UniProtKB/Swiss-Prot annotation:
It comes from Lachnoclostridium phytofermentans (strain ATCC 700394 / DSM 18823 / ISDg). Pfam families: RemA-like. This is Putative regulatory protein Cphy_2880. NCBIfam families: PRK04323.1. InterPro entries: RemA-like.
Length: 91
């Protein structure tokens, strides 16, 4: 089953399709975001706020979030620990 992770302001992404969550300050990341915007494969989920995390998806899409990368990573890890506990309890 696909698990959805909240990336802020009611926006969610499929946790199983996330490749990386990175900070947008580095020049190569800025170029990657600009290229994605130019090609139409960028999803801006910041609701007008400053972008603090760039989520790279398996599909090649880039998702911009106003949450910190650490916050998104904690939410993904929290989902994984809940899943592993459910599997352990089923045994």
């Amino acid at each position: 089953m696909n698990k959805l992770i909240n990336i802020g302001f009611g926006n969610v992404v499929n946790a199983g399709k996330i490749i990386s969550v990175i900070r947008p300050e580095a020049a190569p990341v800025k170029r990657m975001v600009q290229n994605a915007k130019d090609s139409g494969s960028c999803v801006d989920a910041t609701c007008g706020r400053k972008c603090k995390a760039v989520v790279v998806m398996e599909t090649g899409q880039i998702v911009l979030s106003a949450l910190l990368p650490e916050t998104i990573a904690n939410r993904v890890n929290q989902r994984e620990s809940i899943e592993s506990n459910e599997v352990f309890q089923a045994l």
